[in-house]
Amino acid sequence: MKAWKKTIVILFAKAYNDAKEYVFVLYLEGKRMDTLDELYFTMLKNAADGKVELAPEGADPKIVECFVLPDDGTVVRVKPCLCPPDERHCEDACEWDALKPGGEVGIAVDPKKCVGCQACIDACEMESLKTKKDIIPVVQELHQYDGPVYALVAPAIAGQFGADVTLGKMRATLKALGFTGMLEVAAFADILTLKEALEFDKNIRSENDFQLTSCCCPMWIAMIKKLYHQLLPNVPGSVSPMIAGGRTVKALHPQAKTVFIGPCLAKKAEKNEPDIEGAIDYVLTYQELRDLLTVTNLNPAEMPEDSQPHASTTGISYAYAGGVAAAVKRTLEKLNPDRKIKLATRRADGVPGCKEMINDILAGNRDGNFFEGMGCIGGCVGGPRAIIPKEEGKKQVQAYADAAEFETPMENPYVIGMLKALGFNTVEEFLTKSHLYDRQF
């Protein structure tokens, strides 16, 4: 933060302290701390060491709550907003009407409207808005919870912690941190790929019919629900792969805690949506996991291999823009190769691009019948909490997808085995008789 900004914050801190609002001047062992990062890493290290008291004496309790108390919000205000009412760039940047005037403290975030896109955080010049972190409560669960705690990793994880860090090494790393096991969310994307292919085969009967995807992107789904709700009948009734994974784990292990790990902030908001809450207990970003590895001195590259491949090429491909549409198309071609009306895709990534595509659909300018939207440029590999550039991320994911033993979920024995554990003999039987992965929009 620039020096003049820091000075302003300190000048205003005492006035707001009387109102029990956020104070930015922190103290650690008698020494003043001028950044939230110092407090965050101190608390994270204490949690990793198994200490009960995490925050140093003198730390503002409201700021401590940002790190240790999960709530129903993704964006939190860590100090008062000092911007004039007509110069609040965060409010202008929000597409979802989630930021409103907040009395003496300037701005308030409505967690029910916020989708976690981070636009307001990027626009806030005073650094008053931050994203909620779940890593400290997760570490506490790993130390204190008696039941199993499973990590569910998004397919964009390939290459995020180093080009030589395989999924097997990441599994060993997560187990060393205390997780019971690691599951690839791409395996659940496999099942949803077949679900969407079957939905397309059932519902697209004429040249005027069309389907909107992707269920995996909460920003895309939120855009349709909040801004273009007239198109909801064209959205397949499916949960995201993250929610599908959480529901499956809890169906097989009711006492389990589920922790999703990915590059996306919007997933923190998605897990709390009323119709799907409970499937995922915590959402971590890759950067939060990296922070934990830093304070525990664990290097994934030095860990042994614990390889248990779960996913097929199509499921892994969900991580980059165009991957979902390609996955459904390849699966549909195997499912019904003689289909007369072929799947014709159009995709968009980034909020402006998605809006342009939707407006074309509403105007009748449809040049496809299967439309994929991703809120981030490049798809999940371009998520705001990815560690490596999206171009490198896509390259790493494609290499991992190409190396997969199975091309589609129809040949994937892990998927079949998982469904048999749920009481179904085939994917088709599961999708027609179970509502575990259904969602009503």
Positions of PLM-derived features:
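Short, intrinsically disordered, charge-biased short linear motifs at domain edges
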Residues: L69, V78-L82, L99-G103, D110-P111, ...
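Iron-sulfur cluster-binding cysteine motifs and their immediate structural context
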Residues: P84-D110, V115, A119-I135, I387
